[in-house]
UniProtKB/Swiss-Prot annotation:
Organism of origin: Monodelphis domestica (Gray short-tailed opossum)
GO molecular function: hormone activity; prolactin receptor binding
Any single GO BP term: response to nutrient levels
Protein name: Prolactin
Keyword Oxidoreductase: no
Positions of disulphide bridges: 33-40, 87-203, 220-228
Gene name linked to the record: PRL
Protein origin, superkingdom: Eukaryota
UniProt similarity note: Belongs to the somatotropin/prolactin family.
Length: 228
């Protein structure tokens, strides 16, 4: 391995990481309880502001990552026809559009958001691990996967705080959809492995878009009394 080439690649990854951190600086600046704080109170409005910004931040790079992977690895392979309705979260009954979401009680929609976010904790962890092992995987894809995993954790934490304020005392069972796709990400057969990545990124883009829409609807209902 060429030390100079490795140094350049490392510098590029560091630059991309710094750029990504800068882009989500606005989210970091919103009020949130510091680690270990006792009796820290953050308003429901501030919590929703942060959650909506995080969900948008997650959806945007999710779309970019899918598009980049599609262009680099999936052209001419017919993956899109196989990816339809094959997401691990399909077992969760999620509204497909705004009109359907408006028919759901806010309690149920809040819990649904929690379930979808929890369903992505494990696959996002393994996505980062497996992208690292891909030969010639672009640094941009790895960086986006790392950031999305981190922000999904933050969003889940924020949603738990929101549910705690909207329905204090209620504890929703940690229900989520189990992901069993790791063996496919590690397959020796290239087509099988690439489709597993493609499908996971396709589902991530889909679900992050849904979460983004659900949170905007919930914020409108609970913060602005549906006057938006």
């Amino acid at each position: 391995m060429c030390p100079k080439g490795s140094s350049v690649k490392g510098s590029l990854l560091l630059l991309l990481l710094m750029s990504s951190r800068f882009l989500f600086k606005a989210v970091e600046s919103l009020p949130i309880c510091p680690s270990g704080a006792v009796n820290c109170q953050v308003s429901l409005s501030d919590l929703f502001d942060r959650a909506v910004m995080l969900s948008h931040y997650i959806h945007s790079p999710s779309s970019e990552m899918f598009n980049e992977f599609d262009e680099r690895y999936a052209q001419g392979r017919g993956f899109i026809t196989k990816a339809i309705n094959s997401c691990h979260t399909s077992s969760l009954s999620t509204p497909e559009d705004k009109e359907q979401a408006q028919q759901i009680r806010h309690e149920d929609l809040l819990n649904l958001v929690l379930r979808v976010l929890r369903s992505w904790s494990e696959p996002l962890y393994h996505l980062v691990t497996e992208v690292r092992s891909m030969q010639e995987a672009p640094d941009t894809i790895l960086l986006k996967a790392m950031e999305i995993e981190e922000q999904n954790k933050r969003l889940l934490e924020g949603m738990e705080k929101i549910v705690g304020q909207v329905h204090p005392g209620d504890r929703e069972n940690e229900v989520y959809s189990v992901w069993s796709g790791l063996p496919s990400l590690q397959m020796a057969d290239e087509d099988t492995r690439l489709f597993a990545f493609y499908n996971l990124l396709h589902c991530l883009r889909r679900d992050s878009h849904k979460i983004d829409n659900y949170l905007k609807l919930l914020k409108c209902r609970l913060i602005h009394d549906s006057n938006c």
